[in-house]
Amino acid sequence: MVDTKKEQERDELHRAIWAIADELRGAVDGWDFKNYVLGTMFYRYISENLCNYINSGEIEAGNTDFDFAEMLDEDAEEARDGLVEEKGFFILPSELFCNVRAKAADDENLNETLERVFRHIEESAKGSEAENDFAGLFDDYDVNSNKLGATVAKRNEKLVKLLNGVGDMNLGDVKDHSIDAFGDAYEYLMTMYASNAGKSGGEFFTPADVSELLTRLGTVGKTEINKVYDPACGSGSLLLKAESILGKDAIRNGFYGQEINITTYNLCRINMFLHDVGFDKFNIACEDTLISPQHWDDEPFELIVSNLPYSIKWAGDENPLLINDPRFAPAGVLAPKSKADMAFIMHSLSWLASNGTAAIVCFPGIMYRGGAEKKIRQYLIDNSYVDCIIQLPNNLFFGTSIATCIMVMKKNKTDNKVLFIDATNECVKVTNNNKLTPENIEHIVDIFAKREEILHFSHLANYEEVVENDYNLSVSTYVEAEDTREKIDIVKLNAEIKEIVAREQVLRDEIDKIIAEIEGNI
């Protein structure tokens, strides 16, 4: 049951956070400014997280008045190695968010101070298992950018406002509240930035309702999974949805993803930390997934979820090595150079565990286009890998109104049937976008789990039917849309027409009579 009061408090907090973030940016474009707000939030979080970790240990040991933030740097240095091993990073007391913020207004070199602090945080992880997780995390936080101001003084003025604005966000105290408050606020801000950014926002963020549906589809009947993977992970929100649905300890061996855009890659790693995912529980890489996959040693994955980039270009047959790549070779053909969608599908299938499920948002064209894409569909169907195709409503995503599909794949199917679901109308309109409600999601997942046939909504097609349709996997080929046009009673209509014609004749006769009388009087 939904806690209405808690939801209201959450909404109020979100509105307050967005008001602060929006006020902070001033005349700077929100999309450009997001890295500063989100980066500052991350700096605050890891500072408070480290303090809480150290203080809790000291209090348990009986040192009830201890506060790491008040220690001298030289005394704190003694604990550096142990803390890096346990937490993955270290921050000197003088460089904690609270202490830098307290002196910020009087620091004429605040830009240099922050630059040094961020460099020290990243360097603290060097040589440890967390090195790759922290390397370059603050690269997009340019304290000397003209976006912050034309002069050093103006830039520092903006940085002071940033520290105070994020410091004033009511995210609770880590020791008294769920640290997910930070993660929740971060997700909310990313949603707002993405919705205001149009196309570029849609490229890095999957709306929460779509993430929920994908993850629910991929975890039907499961209470835990070994690993979750996203080959185009964006800001990581879709990866993290598995934890919110199954529970914190239900992802036994962690989160894996790859992202080609370095700014988005940094946002993803920050997102992991803000959701209290330990550095040893996630592995996010920044590379081209199709050409340079980074998780050969980590696959297979029990859950694969992704909102793929739509019909982007890739090397394809220009690279002679790819046709022999074990991910693509089984289909005997490569996805077209101009449309990489099916390459991502084959990559995901290759890395899917035998007991796993892949739920992937796809561009609808891959369901019916000919050529190489048809041959790959044939391979998928002939080998019984396609479990379900779901047609989604249009306008669900930021920056595009296109109606996408979900392809669900499994390797352990016991039949060669494919369930087709037409969820075109499973949504409500919210401002400029459509949205899947909890009821919409529940309905789709319920029919998916039961593999149930419902007139005008779902159809379970056998192998022969798909072959007869030339391996076309468009939902409209198998699920007839309901005719919502008004049904016409022909007999009643003819009677009405006959009555109108008769009435018309009566009126004509009366008009003729009037005209005759007028002419007779002339």
Predicted segments, located by residue:
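Non-catalytic, mostly N-terminal accessory regions of nucleic-acid modification and defense proteins
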Residues: 1-213, 217-218, 222, 280-292, ...
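A conserved structural/catalytic subdomain of Rossmann-like adenosyl-cofactor enzymes
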Residues: 2-4, 8, 298-522
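Conserved, well-folded catalytic cores of nucleic-acid-processing
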Residues: 23, 165, 169, 188, ...
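A structure-centric signal for secondary-structure junctions around beta-strands
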Residues: 37, 182, 225, 252, ...
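Conserved S-adenosyl-L-methionine
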Residues: 200-306, 311-313, 317-322, 327-332, ...
